[in-house]
Amino acid sequence: MRIVDVAETTKPIASPIRNAYIDFTKMTTSLVAVVTDVVRDGRRVVGYGFNSNGRYGQGGLIRERFRNRILEAEPRSLLDDQRTNLDPHRIWAAMMANEKPGGHGERSVAVGTLDMAIWDAVAKIAGKPLFRLLAEKKGRRPIRVSSSMRRVVITTRARIIRRSRPRCAVISAAATMWSR
């Protein structure tokens, strides 16, 4: 079991909408496909991800740094302990090799886009919807989510966390946080 390709394409959102901060008419988004050699129901398993609007596509970072690190890693080093699925945490460690610690906004968009595609592939290999796969993980972890543009209200397993006017923007891969 291994990742055989990571494909990225940058596409325009081309939407005539805008808000108080952003005009989306020239905004782009990255679309990512993490292609594996696993076959389910006669079809190759491919995980898909995209970055949200409000940030531009990050094709350069994905294609020039992160894709290469994933594909150059020893395939077995990216598998879980049972060798039955990909391990998103090990893949994340491989793609972040030689990166300076810290958030660094545009990089987090690229990594989050890949993270989404990796988790999609993991769920497909497991034969489960992603929400079920994540729900099987034991324990709770606090998640910090904030935004500089709006008030954030997050429902976390029947607990509501409210933050009024957070000071910094943090992009976090919730799937990774829940599964640890």
Q: What does each model-identified segment do?
A:
Residues K26-T28, R63, P142:
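A short, structural micro-pattern
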Residues M1-E8, N19-D23, A93-M95, E99-G102, ...:
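N-terminal amphipathic alpha-helix/helix-capping segment at the start of soluble metabolic enzymes
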Residues V39-A126:
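Metal- or metallocofactor-binding catalytic centers and their adjacent structured scaffolds
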Residues G139-R180:
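Metal-dependent enolase-superfamily TIM-barrel catalytic cores that perform enediolate-based chemistry
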Residues M1-G59:
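Structured beta-strand/loop patches that form or line metal/cofactor-binding pockets in enzymes
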Residues S108-R132, G139, S146-S147, R151-V152, ...:
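Conserved structural scaffold segments of CAZyme catalytic domains across common CAZy folds
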Residues P16-N19, A117, S164:
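Short alpha-helical segments and helix-capping/turn motifs at coil-helix boundaries
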